[in-house]
């Protein structure tokens, strides 16, 4: 589990497992892994999930994204949400991009 000793996911905990996370991402055609949401801004609690933003290789599908989520949840022992980097410039997409920090 990614934790600081209290069961709270942290950016530092994720970065300690960076190589493992990037290896899993690459298996599913994902790169440029970034963290956003409560973990990125330091507001996570014991019930928080991990929100990741990724770039997917051309030709990859929702099945690749689903496989990535399942493999990361198994490795990290916590619910993980993964979004592909939005191509459109909506207000929500811009907020996520601003908040996202490199793994």
Each model region followed by its residue ranges:
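Conserved histidines in hydrophobic membrane contexts and catalytic metal-binding motifs
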Residues: 35
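Catalytic core of pol beta-like nucleotidyltransferases
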Residues: 1-32, 40-46, 57-103
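Structural signature of FAD isoalloxazine-binding scaffolds in flavoprotein oxidoreductases
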Residues: 54
